[in-house]
């Protein structure tokens, strides 16, 4: 089976009918001639293994669950801003277990003023907090007892009910993310490409599984690294006509793979001296942060393609020759916990839209 872009089909149709007439019989004739005259320009659909297809479904489901969790948390934040600003001052991450346990006990400013430290301590312990509880309790208790402007009692009660309903949805979303992440990890660890992918600096299990899910394990799908880079959207697009040449970022791409590649840039900088030096060089040449990050991940995608084709693990000395090779850190961050749950990086990723 061969997949052909509908826009390409319309261009082929103009070769046989300049008047732009269209019929089912004519389209069948055009499609047949496409594969007869230009078979080398079109590829058949990839044949991925059953395990790779299952990872594809789990990785996309997990990413959707993460987006749902973020969306619900933002809705809850919007409601709390209207009647409970002291709670927002106490917690940056509303999806954290401490924030959800506290809001369950004190859904309104009135309940927050009445909240006692022993009750809050017990709630945090039930939520799974084991260390630093006294200091956390003191911080939360002090924040909730700060004076604030209040809504009328009936309005405040109604908003508290709204926040409680969103809290239940957020609890479900958090549980869904945790469950899907566990299942995704088990499936990804069984794949033979997992060790090669996670040998790259900054590629955790979740982020590596997302990349594997989008590129698959049919190695004939991308004969060269150039095709994979274009598929991920990290390779630039060059438009040349006469004396004019324009190089721009690629807009048509696999958006999920492009998003994973974007998230890969920051941990790669933290854990690869060669990548950090390469990124710094691009910035010194005048590239913006996003342009330098795309250039870095473009190189990383190319190295990943080579390692998967040759069944080799990542080697820093070969990946970035003539660059510093001393280890910067040994810790690999999680893609979601390190790059998706903080307010600062929500601002950084504000231009990435859900496909």
What is the meaning of each model-derived region?
Residues 1-355:
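A detector of single, family-specific signature residues
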